[in-house]
UniProtKB/Swiss-Prot annotation:
Post-translational modification: Methylated by PrmC. Methylation increases the termination efficiency of RF1.
Recorded superkingdom: Bacteria
The protein's name: Peptide chain release factor 1
High-level lineage: Bacteria, Pseudomonadati, Pseudomonadota, Gammaproteobacteria, Alteromonadales
Function: Peptide chain release factor 1 directs the termination of translation in response to the peptide chain termination codons UAG and UAA.
């Protein structure tokens, strides 16, 4: 392992001991905000520190085994050779683990997420597939014990959604779901297709992190145009007969958010503002990323048929993840929310990109 990496790990070990001491300090315990921040830092350091201590132990085992090579006893020397081999393999494994643990963390990975699903090319079939993706994400959220809340929806004429925005609340929600951003293409025979021809439709998915209140960007009320209107619905006793739906336009960016799922205008406004903050923050994040790294691959596509991240082929039962050339013949399982088979390899590829960038920086 490089000396610079060792020094960094030693610094983290020292910091871990400092934080542990501070957590036992009465003045820190009395300050709940600081105590929570230090507790979070300690939990983040713990895994790296444990890995580094294991690395140090393996290094000590290797040195000890090398000393045994000086023994006169042939059997002892043979045993030493085996121990050296095992220690080197363990050091290699731990070094790879530590490199990943040292990768820069996205500070938003642990936040809640907003998922926007919009029907693109394909008309009614695109809206129906947008509904299928909503169901897929709902199942995935359920499997991860996350809470899912519909913020806004516009139903399709023949089922599904022209657009739906949901909030997913739970630990690590954004960190996993952020890789879903992009154009999702579906190939299948629509129920209304009498000739049995396969149609291609497109749906856009955009995933944004929630902006915590403490870090909320400042939105000038003068920059907002707020309209109220009557909620639309399928009819019946639950249709809202008052102007409780809200449409907020952020004039400087042109971002428009509508919320009409709640009966209360106040609740719809609060939801619309939280989505608006996330969208504005997403724009700022993208500007920053572009400035920092112009060659970075964007996770967000336009939703056009030609710009896709994933294809779902129903006749073949196939899912193709184009960003990493991954093909799975597990379409039914994926549509039922088994997304880890795709998100796991995507995360590994992302880590590999970060490791390559880190290696370039270190020369």
């Amino acid at each position: 392992m490089k000396e610079s990496v060792i020094r960094k790990l030693e610094g983290l070990l020292e910091r871990n001991e400092e934080v542990l001491a501070l957590l036992g300090d009465a003045s820190v315990i009395a300050d709940q905000e600081r105590f929570r921040a230090l507790s979070k830092e300690y939990s983040q350091l713990e895994e790296v520190v444990a890995g580094f201590k294991a690395y140090q132990q393996a290094q000590a085992d290797l040195e000890s085994a090398k000393e045994m090579l000086e023994e006169d006893d042939a059997e002892m020397r043979e045993m030493a050779q085996e121990e050296i081999k095992a220690a080197k393999a363990e050091l290699e494994r731990l070094e790879a683990e530590l490199q990943i643990l040292l990768l820069p963390k996205d500070p938003n990975d642990d936040t809640n997420a907003f998922i926007e699903i919009r029907a693109g090319a394909g008309g009614d079939e695109a809206a129906i597939f947008a509904g299928d993706l909503f169901r897929m994400y709902s199942r995935y959220a359920e499997a991860n014990r996350w809470q899912l809340e519909i913020m806004s929806s516009n139903e399709g004429e023949h089922g599904g959604f022209k657009e739906i925005i949901v909030k997913v609340s739970g630990e690590g929600a954004y960190g996993k779901l952020k890789f879903e951003s992009g154009g999702h293409r579906v190939q299948r025979v629509p129920e209304t297709e009498s000739q049995g021809r396969v149609h291609t439709s497109a749906v856009t998915v955009v995933v944004m992190h929630e902006v915590p209140e403490a870090e909320a960007i400042s939105i000038n009320p003068a920059d907002l145009k707020v309209d109220t209107f009557r909620s639309s619905g399928a009819g019946g006793q639950h249709v809202n007969k008052t102007d409780s739906a809200i449409r907020i336009t952020h004039i400087p960016t042109g971002i428009v958010v509508e919320c009409q799922d709640q009966r209360s205008q106040h609740k719809n406004r609060a939801q619309a503002m939280s989505v608006l903050a996330a969208r504005i923050q997403a724009v700022e994040d993208e500007k920053r990323r572009s400035a920092e790294e112009s060659t970075r691959r964007s996770l967000v596509a336009s939703g056009d048929r030609s710009e896709r991240v994933r294809t779902y082929n129903f006749p073949q039962g196939r899912v193709s993840e184009h960003r990493i050339n991954l093909t799975l013949y597990r379409l039914n399982e994926v549509m039922e929310g088994d997304l880890d088979a795709i998100l796991g390899p995507l995360m590994q590829e992302h880590q590999a990109d970060l490791l390559a960038a880190l290696a370039d920086e270190q020369g």
